[in-house]
Design a protein with these regions (language model features):
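Short amphipathic helical patch at the helix-1/turn junction of helix-turn-helix
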Residues: 34, 137-138
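Structural signature of beta-strand start/N-cap positions in the alpha/beta core
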Residues: 8, 130-131
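Structural motif
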Residues: 27-28, 127, 151
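GNAT-family acyltransferases
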Residues: 1-105, 122, 165-183
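Conserved acetyl-CoA-binding loop-helix of GNAT-fold acetyltransferases
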Residues: 100-102, 108-125, 141-149
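Positions that flank functional sites
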Residues: 39, 139, 162
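Conserved catalytic-core motifs of GNAT/GCN5-like acyltransferases
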Residues: 133-135, 153-171
Length: 183
């Protein structure tokens, strides 16, 4: 578990299903996320799969970590309002992916920045990571702005790079080195 001023980042649990459903079923939230609008059954299935296959340690290529963001105190204490993921792409190269998604009612309040910055710090400190990468759809400038705020730089734009949810899309690649993050 990772603690920030306002959040507890922890592994997903089946008790989180109602909170997860609130944003994972929202078409605006999942527009740039690689899953469809989810039903309650799909949220349960995804949570069970994450619990069964997710890791708390990144040691081998393909290992991934998913942490939900739980509000620590106040009116929404105990509510899950988002999640971050980190996946080891290459142990040898020290490369890992990072991503985030925020509940629609809790956007633009600094939660995603707070949670993702804490996960970046945790990842660089505890795992064999030297470089974090975020792949961001070019139609999602808000996520690109967040990556920039986190200190990541845009390294590339891949034009018409993939078919995503039935449409051809371009992608930005953002990255940060461990040495840059520690400055």
């Amino acid at each position: 578990m990772i603690e920030t001023d306002r959040l507890l980042l922890r592994p997903i649990s089946l008790t989180d299903v109602d909170d997860l459903l609130e944003y994972q079923s929202n078409p605006e939230i999942v527009r740039y996320i690689p899953w469809p609008e989810r039903t309650r059954e799909q949220v349960i299935e995804a949570a069970e799969k994450t619990i069964a296959t997710g890791k708390l340690d990144l040691k081998e290529d393909g290992d991934f970590l998913v942490l939900v963001w739980e509000i620590k105190s106040g009116e929404f204490e105990g509510k899950v309002i988002g999640q971050s993921n980190m996946g080891l792409k290459s142990l040898r190269g020290g490369n890992a992916d990072i991503g985030w998604v925020t509940h629609q009612n809790f956007q633009r309040q600094g939660y995603a920045f707070e949670a993702t910055k804490a996960l970046m710090e945790f990842g660089f400190k505890n795992f064999p990571i030297r470089r974090l990468i975020a792949d961001i759809d070019t139609r999602n400038p808000e996520s690109a702005a967040m990556a920039t705020k986190l200190g990541m730089r845009r390294e590339a734009e891949f034009v018409d790079a993939e078919i995503f949810k039935g449409s051809l899309c371009s992608m930005w690649l953002y990255a940060i080195l461990k040495s840059e993050f520690q400055k």
